[in-house]
Amino acid sequence: VDLATGVITTVAGDGTAAYSGDQVSAVQASLAGPSGVALGGDGVVYVADTFNSRIRSVDPATGQIATVAGDGGTYRYQGPAEPSSPSLSRPAGIAVGSDGNVYMTDSDSHLIRVWNGRSKTISRLSGTGVAQFGGDGGDALAGSLSYPFGVAVDASGTVYVADTFNHRIRVLTATA
């Protein structure tokens, strides 16, 4: 919504619940249950395309949509020995840090993951992949989450997580 005029317009999605590919006009692209949106410092709009298991970006200069994380496959984290996977399982919450990294909830895998904008890689930031509560005061990678649906990051890089099914807001800091 343009606050000056009160006009609402569509930035992404054609109203069809599907996946229609990348490098097309964002308003002609299909999304399936978008549930999170965040704005990068460079004006890029990031969308949690939840039921397509992807994080998408809309370029402000071209209006084109692209996938930045997720490949449409269903991801189920199996443990720390497992190689990193580009797949996501129902990403919902999304936030962009001042460093340009995109933080996301990998909700059905019970993880918080981060996409590094420079290296174009995705890694696990928190969660064990098991829906339970645990790990307060310890290593974030050993801390358990249960269906996290929201994430935010402040200017100092502290990450806040809506640990939805544990009915808690969790904080990930450099010392915890």
Language-model features: locations:
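Glycine-centered low-complexity coil/loop motifs and glycine-rich tracts
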Residues: 18, 48, 105, 131-132, ...
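Residue-level detector of Asp-centered blade-edge/turn motifs that repeat once per structural unit
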Residues: 39-42, 96-99, 153-156
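Gly/Pro-rich loop segments of beta-rich domains
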Residues: 5-33, 62-92, 119-149, 175-176
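Short loop/turn segments immediately following the C-termini of beta-strands
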Residues: 3, 50-51, 107, 117, ...
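A short loop-to-beta-strand structural motif that recurs across blades of beta-propeller domains
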Residues: 7, 53-57, 64, 110-114, ...
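Conserved beta-propeller blade signature
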Residues: 44-47, 101-103, 158-161
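Blade-level signature of beta-propeller repeat domains, shared across WD40, Kelch, NHL, RCC1
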Residues: 149-175
